Amino acid sequence: PYTIVIPPPNVTGMLTMGHVLNNTIQDILIRKARMEGKEACWIPGTDHASIATETKVIKMLEEKGINKNDLSREEFLEHAWEWKEKYGGIIINQLKKLGCSCDWERERFTMDEGYSNAVLESFVKLYNKGLIYKGHRLVNWCPVSKSAISDEEVVHKEINGQLWYFRYPIKGENEYLVVATTRPETMLGDSAVAVNPNDKRYIKHIGKTIDLPLVGREIPIIADDYVDPDFGTGCVKITPAHDPNDFAIGKRHDLEFINVMNEDASINENAPQKYIGQDRFDARKQIIRDIDQNGLLDKTEEYVNKVGFSERGDVPIEFYMSDQWFMKMNDLVKPAIDAVKSGEIKFHPEHWVKTYNHWMDNIKDWCISRQLLWGHQIPVWYHKEDKTRLHVSVSGPDDIENWEQDKDVLDTWASSWIWPMGVHDWPEENEELNKFFPTNTLVTGPDIIFFWVARMIITGYEFLDKKPFTDVYFTSILRDETGKKLSKSLGNSPDPFDLFEEYGTDAVRFGIMLMAPQGLDVLFSKERLEIGRNFMNKLWNACRFISMNKPDNWIEGQSIDEIELRLPDKWIISRLNRAIKNYNKQMDRFHFNEAAKVLYDYIWNDFCDWYIEIAKTRFYSNDDSKMITYNICIESIRKILPLLHPYTPFITEELWSFFKIENDKDLIISPWPVVDESAINEKID
């Protein structure tokens, strides 16, 4: 068999040009495999996309005047399922309109019952192995969704801001240390000031105490090698509950971890009364004013800072102390690293191996819990009488009335990471799983190499001791003609279905493949779509011309007599077989745009502009050349159309009907053309 699993589109809206590129490539691979006689299986489906979909549903509810917080979990999930049914259905219909020849009866959704059980089973198995644990740790926090998010869901933006220098008085002395910060509001949670142990300026102060301004808390001056004496003033305020580097220092020095923010990033009761309840940025302004009024503002500098934003919430994240579920990744990655290094799994283009290895070699424990409603609820129950008693299973405890389930859901990627086997009802042993797993090729974007690709490889080896796929093809990034990434938010991404109406679906498919070289970004251009449309017209006209000039005495299946062939005939047959050979070579290397160019060049230049012109004069003659020419045209067309079919399925299937002979099948299941090496003539080619 030849198997592909679709990277399931999120049920958050409509398909984009990126989806068109990705799914056209998959369709090319699956149609070719099917015509080669393989049992081709392409599993379609959609992803619940936890945080992305929940954000959309909340916005939809707000437009109706409904606040999420006024709904019960069950009521909110009803709205989310309605959203899924609407947009999931639209996406599937759009994939069909694109021409995707999926096994539609095998369609899956990452929250359908069987798949959900598989997701929860993966959690239980890893928990029982000691690879999943709950910890109170610093996480990336989105104040909009009020949830932890992963490093990969944080977008860093350069922001023009300020660097404020505050004077921190040393207790009992008429001296102070100057610390710099871009986030003054976090000073409310400071636990220490750190200096380098070898910094001669401050050695005498190590062990002394700071009177923390505005707060009145006494905090120590500590020595730590992390501090760079040449950066800034050489003094660093330490806020272990609100900064990852400070968190590590806090652990080393057993400092107090003081969280001064609520889940929405407003200031909490651990701060002085006047700041409680203020938004973090309002508190920042107030703190700067108060520091200045106390004569403790040393100076302010303009500063360009890289700030992490929540990808979905589009607000600056906070580093936030929170109880979360984590997965120990170091214990899982070795087989996945070895598989790619050994070539058991191949990346196309190969340069992505370096990126993959770097991430895997520096992997951290994965925060897999999210404080959301839409998703797979974590299969952990706490006893109502004793919260330290846990029950972990897919179905829950028998006396469930005495237990309360964890309210958090799993990170979306902790469900889609089992996709290649979950779609075949893993962990149940079954014929489908044995037949179609491992899959052959994964087609995906390089932007989710960590989110998804690496994690699927990990699960394949962890749960089945098999690679989940043999080849990974990373698609190009689509950019506009100025080099900006195509994006709906930027307004530079056309609606693909408007383009289908304007140019035709086949023309868009062929045009986008012409402009998508392996390993390079794609400069999207409507001119290429024009080329695609003109090419479809050229092919259509050539086929119509040939079909209209069938000789009256033509016999179906008549072979070409080598002796009767003239030089132009031998030349076009040689060019045809060379084109088939080159096309197959490019396809085997995953060079889809080069394969498209081979077909374009042969059909437009050799066949249409050259041989068809000769055919025009021969078709109006009464000698044997008319029959020979028609036979050669038929042989060319009956090999051209199958080669072109994976790229342009609609027009080729229609044209195939013009030239069908007895016992012919539909083009989609017709045999793949075979190269006749003996027909390739180096001398005349």
Identify the function of each model-found stretch:
Residues 157, 238-241, 281, 318, ...:
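Conserved phosphate-binding loops in nucleotide/dinucleotide-binding enzymes
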Residues 217-222, 407-437, 605, 609-612:
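Active-site-adjacent "gating/activation" loops or surface patches in catalytic cores
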Residues 309-313, 477-482, 486-565, 661-663, ...:
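Catalytic adenosine-cofactor/nucleotide-binding cores of aminoacyl-tRNA synthetases and other
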Residues 1-198, 239-252, 256-271, 280, ...:
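N-terminal, positively charged nucleic-acid-binding surface of large information/translation enzymes
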Residues 257-264, 307-310, 379-382, 469-491:
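Active-site and channel-lining beta-strand-loop segments
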Residues 18, 45-48, 76-81, 105-116, ...:
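Conserved short loop/turn motifs at secondary-structure junctions
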Residues 47, 143, 150-155, 382, ...:
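Acidic, turn-prone loop/beta-hairpin segments
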Residues 114-147, 153-155, 167-171, 359-413, ...:
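Gly/Pro-rich turn-and-neighbor structural signature
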